[in-house]
Amino acid sequence: MNGLYALVYNNYIQSGGVGISKGISLQENGSGSKVLFNSVNITGTDVVNGQALEVLGGTNYTIKNNIFANNGGGYASYFASDLSSFAMDYNDYFSTKRKIAFYNNINYDTLSAFSAVTGKDANSKSVNPYYTSVTNLIPNHTLLNRTGIAVTGTTTDIDGATRGVNPDMGAKEFSPCVNDAGVNEFWGLSNPLPVGSQPIKVILQNQGTNTLTSATIQWEVNGVAQVPFSWTGSL
């Protein structure tokens, strides 16, 4: 967008391929534009020009309750503009390569580091939304459920359902699974992987609403199923 004002809300946005993949792009000369309740999924393989959110200029933007996910290895957000006048919070930023934000020529691989420098996104998240599919952008992560903030004038979701007092992040109001465990990330893997056998550690995350006391982890090596791992505890 390259104009004075725009309201962008309640959208599913997916972009893939091998070239430039942009979700929402705010260009120069904008003022007061609002980006609210959008679900973005970038699957393009360009790790530099793949950006779920791009801000190249403008002032006084409001950016809230969005999911900016880059599953192609690029940036969740890219800023070439001063953020001091922005109202930016209650968003989810996710990148498979930990490229949460690019700002002032620095890549921030954690949301906490980006927030500490900018003073923005204090209530935002950095989790994989686990979209239902590449193009069906209903999230399935409990940390995005009821963790947004109400915004005047945007009281219904993309399908016309009424948003709650504490709305969900993204374009769609959703109900997470009751019992749902998932692998949040692999721990300590180097890139590229060294030759030979290596221990594999993963971080298991409760993505449902109930406390979990057990889970069975299925896994494969080169397409060959291995002995399932049984976990017990409290999560």
Locate each region found by the language model.
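Right-handed parallel beta-helix
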Residues: 1-17, 25, 31-44, 59-70, ...
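Short glycine/acidic-rich loop motifs that flank beta-strands on beta-rich extracellular proteins
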Residues: 1-2, 13, 17-24, 43-52, ...
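C-terminal accessory segments
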Residues: 92, 108-173
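Extracellular/luminal regions of secreted and cell-surface proteins that mediate adhesion/ECM remodeling
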Residues: 176-235
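Residue-level preference for beta-strand/loop junctions
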Residues: 4, 59, 165, 195-196, ...
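Short aromatic-centered micro-motifs
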Residues: 101, 156, 219-220
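Acidic glycine-/aspartate-rich tracts in secreted/extracellular proteins
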Residues: 46, 71-73, 92-100, 146-153, ...
